[in-house]
Amino acid sequence: MKIKLVVVGKLKEKYLKDGIAEYVKRMGTMLPLEIIELADEKIPDNASEKEAEALKKREGDKILSRIQTGDKLAILAIQGKLMSSEELADFVKKAEVYGTGNLVFVIGGSLGLSEEVYKRSDLQISFGRMTLPHQLMRLVLVEQIYRAQMINRGSVYHK
């Protein structure tokens, strides 16, 4: 099994790239992490609700094109389930033991995720009700994936 992180938009800030690279390096071959960046749709300043929904659907179609049959899909959503690090570790472990495909985490674009992506998801995770920049959320999620692996291996990293 591989863990994939499908994200909408390009990561620009060096400090975030460096932080993510550090956790990816630490994970090594334990449970490989692949990050897939998808181009975000350009949103006109005066986009109507209908136009915004069409853009969100196009981004959703791009996301779903990266999901294979058998993959376990966890999306980040403000209204999702609040989880502890231990609960996330349990989810990762079950996907590793019982899964038939990869474990895929998704961070959507500034418009959020399409209804189709929500319907395909196996789990909706919330990191709280606060809005965080999508690029910062990548670092937070990658750290939590690393932490989950350390919990599952009985490491002292998680205290």
Swiss-Prot record:
The keyword Acyltransferase does not apply. GO terms for cellular component: cytoplasm. InterPro entries: Alpha/beta_knot_MTases, RlmH-like, tRNA_m1G_MTases_N. The keyword Transferase applies. Keywords: Cytoplasm, Methyltransferase, rRNA processing, S-adenosyl-L-methionine, Transferase. It is found in: Cytoplasm. Gene3D superfamilies: 3.40.1280.10. Its EC number is 2.1.1.177. GO terms for molecular function: rRNA (pseudouridine-N3-)-methyltransferase activity. Its main location: cytoplasm. It is an enzyme of class 2 (transferase). S-adenosyl-L-methionine binds at residues 76, 108, 127-132. It catalyses: pseudouridine(1915) in 23S rRNA + S-adenosyl-L-methionine = N(3)-methylpseudouridine(1915) in 23S rRNA + S-adenosyl-L-homocysteine + H(+). It holds the Pfam family SPOUT_MTase. Belongs to the RNA methyltransferase RlmH family. HAMAP family: 23SrRNA_methyltr_H. Homodimer. Specifically methylates the pseudouridine at position 1915 (m3Psi1915) in 23S rRNA. This is Ribosomal RNA large subunit methyltransferase H.
